[in-house]
Amino acid sequence: MGHTLRPGTPLPRCLHLKLCLLLALAGLHFSSGISQVTKSVKEMAALSCDYNISIDELARMRIYWQKDQQMVLSIISGQVEVWPEYKNRTFPDIINNLSLMILALRLSDKGTYTCVVQKNENGSFRREHLTSVTLSIRADFPVPSITDIGHPDPNVKRIRCSASGGFPEPRLAWMEDGEELNAVNTTVDQDLDTELYSVSSELDFNVTNNHSIVCLIKYGELSVSQIFPWSKPKQEPPIDQLPFWVIIPVSGALVLTAVVLYCLACRHVARWKRTRRNEETVGTERLSPIYLGSAQSSG
């Protein structure tokens, strides 16, 4: 036979315990929600444990940071221990929500990190707090660089496009007017330590035409590109193809120059002849004998 509780009647002890347990589980659920942090390679990440603690409380607490069930860092009785993979680049920020600080991020650092806080009560440690943080690592390729590497033939130029330091594996394509061009010497390399990729490719094109060539690098859902513009060299037209308004002044200038040069030459020749004639006259006068006929007859 069922019983009905009157208003104001206190709940049985078992119901109190059930309610307390439900509230505790609800609190644990909300405190263990997974937050997201996204950073780039070589940057610093701060993963918050979302739990405030004073320096004086450290002696009675145990704090564990682990990644995918593997230990990263622990604080026991105030002593910090860092596991080998994270040494010299990982430390706790105790006064800032027990955050885990990771320097010089690597691709291998991506994953879910869990912070566990245990408190000493009556000689035994029980879990006081639990939270998780998912760390995503981006490795973006920079804008590729395009360099001139020579002329395989007189009318052919070769260029190279390259970029490094990105992830995941890239694909490089040369494009012009929406169509992919035929590349040469395309290489993709991955650094075994950092897992980052490098890519380079070369392209030959005819220098007698204008071009707007695009080097496109796709990696995952992202892409970067660089444009290489080329204008064909300007050639001077033959003289017989010059427009008349250019030919007439040029021809007039040439004729005028020729006339001036001819006049100067004639003037120079005339002056030279006159000088020569004067020199000959002076020489003749010096060589002629003195006439003495009248003097001899008078004797």
Curated annotation (Swiss-Prot):
Keywords: Cell membrane, Disulfide bond, Glycoprotein, Immunoglobulin domain, Membrane, Receptor, Signal, Transmembrane, Transmembrane helix. Residues 1-32 form the signal peptide. It is a single-pass type I membrane protein. The chain crosses the membrane at residues 244-264. Disulfide bonds join C49-C115, C161-C215. GO terms for cellular component: external side of plasma membrane. CDD domains: IgC1_CD80, IgV_CD80. Residues 265-299 are cytoplasmic. Residues 144-225 form the Ig-like C2-type domain. Glycans are attached at N52, N88, N97, N122, N185, N206, N210. It is found in: Cell membrane. SUPFAM superfamilies: Immunoglobulin. GO terms for molecular function: coreceptor activity. Pfam families: C2-set_2, V-set. Costimulatory molecule that belongs to the immunoglobulin superfamily that plays an important role in T-lymphocyte activation. Acts as the primary auxiliary signal augmenting the MHC/TCR signal in naive T-cells together with the CD28 receptor which is constitutively expressed on the cell surface of T-cells. In turn, activates different signaling pathways such as NF-kappa-B or MAPK leading to the production of different cytokines. In addition, CD28/CD80 costimulatory signal stimulates glucose metabolism and ATP synthesis of T-cells by activating the PI3K/Akt signaling pathway. PANTHER family: T-LYMPHOCYTE ACTIVATION ANTIGEN, T-LYMPHOCYTE ACTIVATION ANTIGEN CD80. This is T-lymphocyte activation antigen CD80. It comes from Oryctolagus cuniculus (Rabbit).
